[in-house]
């Protein structure tokens, strides 16, 4: 490959992100929904925090994602008994969801996905272009600003299902990541 071909390749790559998503809006949505999740967790655990059974602290993490660059997110650290649970944002550049947060305990990890509130499973389509390339996208199209997004518990692949996240579901998640 010549230097001229490489420069043309780089120039073409620079335009890839501007046509598919407004990444600034996506990052704002992601940060806002992370704040909502943290607030929900604080609310669900408030009586246990007040009783001194659980300690909640915030943890900052730097993520680097293609199209978004480097940015800081806040997760949570829960301490109770001799257990430490980390609620860690993973990213927003995902297929089938607008964001993922892992709930990591000593014996298991559970995945929370930011998906369409009405979804019970992923709605993803693949398309093979005339030149043989495979493209994967949400079957519903590019509409992320118009969707009512909600945090849901996602089962492991290959048959991913979503469960509504509320206080009881969150308590179950905590018990699973501690007990396995």
Predicted regions, residues:
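Intrinsic-disorder-associated interaction segments
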Residues: 2-3, 23, 34, 160-163, ...
């Amino acid at each position: 490959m010549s230097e001229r071909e490489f420069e043309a390749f780089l120039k073409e790559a620079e335009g890839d992100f501007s046509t598919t998503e407004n990444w600034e809006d996506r990052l704002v949505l992601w940060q806002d929904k992370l704040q909502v999740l943290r607030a929900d967790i604080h609310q669900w655990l408030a009586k246990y925090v007040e009783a001194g059974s659980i300690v909640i602290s915030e943890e900052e993490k730097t993520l680097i994602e293609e199209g978004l660059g480097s940015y800081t997110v806040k997760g949570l650290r829960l301490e109770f008994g001799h257990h430490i649970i980390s609620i860690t944002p993973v990213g927003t550049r995902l297929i089938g969801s607008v964001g993922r947060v892992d709930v990591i305990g000593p014996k298991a990890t559970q995945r929370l996905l930011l998906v369409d509130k009405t979804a019970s499973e992923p709605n993803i389509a693949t398309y093979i272009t005339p030149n043989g390339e495979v493209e994967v996208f949400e079957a519903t199209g590019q509409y992320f600003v118009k969707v009512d997004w909600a945090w849901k518990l996602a089962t492991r692949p290959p048959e991913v299902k979503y469960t509504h996240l509320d206080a009881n579901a969150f308590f179950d998640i905590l018990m699973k990541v501690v007990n396995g």
